Amino acid sequence: MAKEVSKVVKLQVKGGAANPSPPVGPALGAAGVNIMEFCKQFNARTQDKAGKVCPVQITVYKDKSFDFVVKTPPAAVQLMEAAKLKSGSGEPNRKKVASVTWDVIKAIAEDKMVDLNAFTAESAMSMIAGTARSMGITVTGDSPLKK
């Protein structure tokens, strides 16, 4: 028989750097999870993503055991990394802060494909390009997307 789910907690934590302080501690403490056990498992699983923001979905069961799934870093974080930015534009329609090429968009889309709600690489690229546009990042070069 399957375990009964008590709660699902979603967090964004830097890879390899989970510790019991906020936001991890309070969120998991309220769910009754052994915080140190989660931190050890998360840090071991995300050593290769050290320093990058990693969304994680933690499923807590009635017996206080847990499972978690680490997802790919958010598209906005990957775009800022590619464009060497600290933050996006406050006024993306008026003030453009950087530019990236379609090759960068394609690389990010391929990386995020498992987490995106897209069936084709083109639709994933369109989503990533939209995220870039909303951050004040222009996409340069000829668009490989169908018109």
Swiss-Prot record:
InterPro entries: Ribosomal_uL11, Ribosomal_uL11_bac-typ, Ribosomal_uL11_C, Ribosomal_uL11_C_sf, Ribosomal_uL11_N, Ribosomal_uL11_N_sf. One of its GO terms (molecular function) is large ribosomal subunit rRNA binding. Keywords: Methylation, Ribonucleoprotein, Ribosomal protein, RNA-binding, rRNA-binding. One or more lysine residues are methylated. One of its GO terms (cellular component) is cytosolic large ribosomal subunit. It comes from the Bacteria. SUPFAM superfamilies: Ribosomal L11/L12e N-terminal domain, Ribosomal protein L11, C-terminal domain. One of its GO terms (biological process) is translation. It holds the Pfam family Ribosomal_L11. Part of the ribosomal stalk of the 50S ribosomal subunit. Interacts with L10 and the large rRNA to form the base of the stalk. L10 forms an elongated spine to which L12 dimers bind in a sequential fashion forming a multimeric L10(L12)X complex. Forms part of the ribosomal stalk which helps the ribosome interact with GTP-bound translation factors. Belongs to the universal ribosomal protein uL11 family. This is Large ribosomal subunit protein uL11. It comes from Flavobacterium psychrophilum (strain ATCC 49511 / DSM 21280 / CIP 103535 / JIP02/86). The gene is rplK.
